C-alpha cells in the first residue's frame, strides 16, 4: 500500500494522475488490466511458493519452487503491448546462476534486451545484493533490437562529472531508440 501511495503521489506531482493505472495484487495472478505501453518494476528476489500458479509460466522450474523474479519478469512482459517497454530492477547476477538458461531461453523469444545497467555498488551493503536495471522491448509491432545494447555501470551518484557523462551517453542512446 505504501508503494502504491508513493507512486500515485509522484504521478500526481508530475501531472500524470489521469494517465496512470496503479494495481495492488499478487503480481502473478491473472490481472484484469489492459496491456501497457510501459511497465516499471523492482522484482523481489527469492522463490515463489505457489507452484500450482507458477506452472502456468514458461520460466517456471520443472521441479520445486521457481524464482519469483523469473516469473515476475514473464508476467510483466505478458502485460506489455507489442513494442512496449519494460524497465526492471533485477539481481545483477540474474544471468549468472545455474538456472539462468530458463530465463534466457524465454527472453530470446519474447523481448529485445536493449540495456543492462548496474546500479552503483555503494548503494548495497553486500556485493551479493547488487541490483541492475534491465530495459527490454517486447517483440512485435515496430520493435527492433538495438544495434548495440547499452551495457555499463551507473556511476556513483555523488560524482557529478561521471554522472553527467553517463547521462549524456544514456540520452544519446535513448534518442536513437525511441
Spans of model-derived segments:
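Conserved S-adenosyl-L-methionine
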Residues: 1-41, 46, 92
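Short glycine-biased active-site loop of nucleotidyltransferases that positions the nucleotide triphosphate
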Residues: 31, 124-128
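Conserved Class I SAM-dependent methyltransferase catalytic core
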Residues: 65-122
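General small-molecule cofactor/ligand-binding pocket signal
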Residues: 21-25, 117, 152
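Conserved nucleotide-binding/hydrolysis micro-motifs of P-loop NTPases
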Residues: 44-47, 93-95, 123, 140-141
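Mobile active-site "lid"/loop adjacent to the S-adenosyl-L-methionine
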Residues: 42-72
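Flexible, glycine-/basic-rich loop-and-beta segments that form/coincide
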Residues: 128-178
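Local beta-strand N-terminus motif with an aromatic residue
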Residues: 35-37, 113, 131
Amino acid at each position: 500500500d505504501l508503494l502504491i501511495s508513493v507512486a500515485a503521489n509522484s504521478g500526481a506531482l508530475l501531472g500524470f494522475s489521469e494517465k496512470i493505472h496503479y494495481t495492488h495484487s499478487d503480481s502473478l495472478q491473472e490481472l484484469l488490466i489492459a496491456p501497457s505501453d510501459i511497465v516499471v518494476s523492482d522484482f523481489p528476489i527469492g522463490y515463489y511458493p505457489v507452484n500450482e500458479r507458477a506452472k502456468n509460466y514458461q520460466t517456471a522450474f520443472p521441479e520445486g519452487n521457481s524464482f519469483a523474479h523469473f516469473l515476475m519478469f514473464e508476467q510483466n512482459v505478458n502485460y506489455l503491448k507489442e513494442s512496449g517497454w519494460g524497465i526492471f530492477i533485477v539481481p545483477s547476477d540474474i544471468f549468472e546462476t545455474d538456472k539462468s538458461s530458463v530465463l534466457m531461453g524465454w527472453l530470446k523469444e519474447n523481448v529485445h534486451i536493449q540495456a543492462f545497467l548496474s546500479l552503483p555498488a555503494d548503494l548495497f551493503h553486500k556485493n551479493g545484493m547488487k541490483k541492475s536495471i534491465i530495459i527490454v522491448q517486447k517483440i512485435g509491432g515496430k520493435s527492433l533490437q538495438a544495434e548495440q545494447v547499452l551495457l555499463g555501470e551507473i556511476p556513483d551518484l555523488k560524482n557529478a562529472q561521471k554522472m553527467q557523462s553517463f547521462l549524456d551517453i544514456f540520452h544519446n542512446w535513448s534518442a536513437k531508440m525511441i
